[in-house]
């Protein structure tokens, strides 16, 4: 199982799947060996290691502008903690993994569709881009990351225009920093309430190592490698079909 987690997390991050942590959570929660809360904890480890490694590859904390970094970190951490607390309350009222799967197939479908759309080229009104709007967007994306396990990066990249206030707010490292902060708060809360399962250290290390290596390899191929970009698009289409199939099975059982 440890090597299966290593290879699956590596290739999910390497090929450019838009929501690798969410896919890992779906697979783990579908397995009878893991409880829903255990799947949340393991997918949080994968997200934290993978996005953290990608953030380091893009320059770390210093790659993000200081004003944006100071505003983003606390609200993203709080949003991730709030989102995970809502999810834990949901899982506490249900037994088994089927309710969690039903909750995840819809955002998985929406995120796959969002990744297929072209980047947002328009711009919002100038007055909508103050510090308060930036904090609100980071808090909302943090809640999405903590509740669904993924999606904050895609939402932030799609909703926040990159042309406005570029010096203060825009940076390719900001979406990754948002996910790392949100996942840190979510994983800390999950660990505090108990993961309902004791994981072997080897399993957790293999999962984190696979996610980190996959993210680093993807960053090296980001500027070149048309084959892997095409493979990523093909895999997104395949995951879209899988999400549709999962939705059909989850809601028609």
List the predicted regions and their residue ranges.
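A generic alpha-helix surface/boundary motif
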Residues: 22-26, 154-155
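Transmembrane alpha-helices of multi-pass small-molecule transport proteins
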Residues: 42-57
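Structural signal for alpha-helical transmembrane segments and their flanking helix-loop junctions
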Residues: 132-190
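Gly/Ser-rich catalytic serine loop of serine hydrolases
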Residues: 17-20, 152
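Juxtamembrane transmembrane-helix boundary motif
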Residues: 1-18, 25-37, 56-146, 162, ...
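Short hydrophobic/aromatic, small-residue-rich stretches within specific transmembrane helices
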Residues: 43-47, 175-179, 203-204, 208
């Amino acid at each position: 199982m440890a090597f299966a987690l290593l290879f699956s997390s590596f290739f999910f991050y390497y090929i450019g799947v838009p929501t690798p942590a969410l896919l890992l959570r779906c697979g783990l929660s579908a397995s009878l060996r893991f409880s829903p809360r255990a799947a949340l904890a393991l997918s949080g480890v994968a997200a934290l290691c993978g996005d953290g490694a990608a953030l380091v590859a893009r320059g770390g904390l210093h790659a993000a502008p200081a004003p944006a970094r100071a505003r983003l970190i606390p609200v993203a951490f709080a949003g991730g903690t709030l989102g995970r607390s809502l999810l834990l309350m949901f899982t506490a009222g249900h037994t088994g993994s089927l309710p969690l799967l039903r909750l995840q197939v819809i955002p998985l479908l929406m995120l796959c569709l969002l990744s297929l759309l072209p980047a947002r080229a328009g711009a919002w009104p100038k007055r909508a881009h103050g510090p308060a709007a930036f904090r609100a967007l980071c808090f909302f994306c943090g809640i999405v990351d903590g509740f669904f396990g993924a999606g904050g990066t895609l939402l932030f990249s799609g909703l926040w225009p990159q042309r406005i206030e570029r010096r203060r707010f825009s940076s390719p490292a900001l979406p990754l920093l948002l996910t790392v902060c949100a996942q840190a708060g979510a994983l800390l809360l999950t660990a505090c309430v108990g993961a309902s399962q004791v994981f072997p250290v080897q399993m957790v290390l293999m999962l984190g190592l696979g996610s980190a290596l996959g993210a680093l390899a993807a960053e090296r191929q980001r500027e070149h490698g048309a084959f892997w970009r095409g493979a990523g698009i093909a895999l997104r289409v395949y995951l879209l079909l899988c999400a549709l199939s999962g939705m059909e099975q989850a809601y028609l059982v």
